[in-house]
């Protein structure tokens, strides 16, 4: 019977590693309720796997990288329409100067991450994921002069907050790159979930954000809850980050509607739908009432990465748009593993 079930699972089964399949076979081989036990085991395991953590850099403070000689900033680093370049060769720019205008509602403004001179507007720039888009190459002057237009926005309501977020160029910093102002536009949201799971092996960027920037995390959360009319916020953090859990639990203890939820240590715990179900018990519907694919707002939730909401907090305080990103540089080939903050558009060769 078990072999028949394996064949029925087809490609689904083949994707699992050998040690997992051996565990399934052992479970199916039990005399009492073998097939039922096997199916329960597979359902439980389908919620995630226990991947090695490899978080050697979790205790290392973030180091700011020296300004590179050149950056190449793609106009399509986000989900949605590419931004349109608004500079040309020879233009002088400062850190925070807008160089790309959002190409639609689902798009993002893009800013110079260094001060210097536009070397070239590249028509066909191939990204690491294989996609091709326009990009702006800037030769740095090494001074990191900040554009005087970078001033804290005045926000008094939801419309103003969404406009400020759109102006900042903020997109999801957990990997998806979805424009944040679009995600928060829905009126059906009653629960804000902050994703601090960071379930991927090696990465420690969100861990360092929680430990180093808790103030701006909370100010970003406060702004979203206040202006979007959201009454509940759950900060989800995997249990392998006890220091983060303790810190944010103590800081939110007296904040109404905000709580910290320790999460199971499994991959992909930080996946949006998995996180929503773990934190709230709700499920994102496959199909919304409109007939389109369901989204978190259809079950009353919105998920923001912990670094994304912290970046929002920083923008509301300083007016500096999204121009840098923390990276974890780790692995057997790395002589000095570390967490570094780099200007957007920094080349891999300069990071390594």
What is each residue range found by the language model?
Residues 93-107, 122, 133-139:
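Short hydrophobic beta/alpha edge segments that flank linear recognition/processing sites
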Residues 83-92, 96:
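Short histidine-centered loop motifs in beta-beta connectors
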Residues 172, 192-206, 333:
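Gly-rich Lys/Arg/Thr-decorated short loops/hinges at beta-loop-alpha junctions or inter-strand turns
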Residues 120, 125-178, 186-187, 242:
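Acidic low-complexity segments
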Residues 34-86, 137:
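N-terminal, Lys/Arg-enriched amphipathic/low-complexity engagement segments
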Residues 24, 231-352:
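Hydrophobic alpha-helical positions that pack around
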């Amino acid at each position: 019977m078990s072999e028949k079930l394996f064949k029925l699972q087809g490609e689904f089964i083949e994707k699992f590693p050998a040690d997992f399949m051996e565990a399934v076979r052992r479970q199916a081989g039990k005399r009492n309720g073998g097939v039922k036990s096997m199916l329960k085991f597979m359902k439980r395991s389908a919620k995630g796997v226990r991947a090695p953590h490899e978080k050697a850099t979790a205790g290392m403070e973030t180091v700011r990288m020296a300004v590179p000689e050149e950056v190449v900033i793609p106009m399509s680093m986000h989900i949605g329409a590419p931004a349109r370049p608004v500079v040309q060769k020879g233009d002088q720019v400062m850190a925070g100067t807008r160089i790309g205008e959002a190409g639609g509602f689902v798009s993002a403004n893009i800013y110079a991450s260094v001060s210097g001179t536009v070397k070239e507007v590249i028509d066909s720039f191939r990204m690491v994921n294989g996609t091709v888009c326009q990009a702006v190459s800037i030769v740095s002057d090494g001074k990191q002069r900040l554009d005087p237009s970078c001033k804290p926005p005045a926000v008094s309501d939801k419309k103003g907050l969404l406009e400020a977020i759109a102006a900042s160029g903020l997109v999801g910093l957990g990997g998806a790159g979805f424009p944040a102002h679009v995600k928060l536009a829905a009126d059906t949201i009653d629960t804000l979930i902050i994703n601090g799971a960071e379930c991927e092996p090696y990465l420690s960027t969100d861990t360092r954000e929680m430990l180093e920037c808790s103030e701006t995390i909370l100010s970003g959360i406060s702004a979203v809850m206040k202006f979007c009319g959201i009454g509940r916020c759950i900060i989800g953090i995997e249990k392998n980050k006890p220091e983060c859990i303790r810190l944010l639990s103590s800081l939110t203890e007296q904040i109404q509607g905000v709580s910290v939820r320790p999460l199971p240590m499994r991959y992909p715990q930080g996946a949006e739908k998995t996180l929503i179900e773990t934190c709230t018990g709700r499920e994102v519907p496959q199909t919304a009432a409109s007939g389109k694919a369901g989204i978190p707002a259809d079950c009353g939730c919105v998920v923001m990465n912990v670094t994304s909401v912290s970046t929002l907090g920083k923008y509301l305080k300083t007016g500096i748009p999204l121009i840098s990103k923390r990276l974890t540089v780790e692995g057997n080939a790395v002589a000095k593993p570390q967490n570094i903050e780099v200007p957007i558009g920094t080349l891999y060769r300069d990071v390594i």
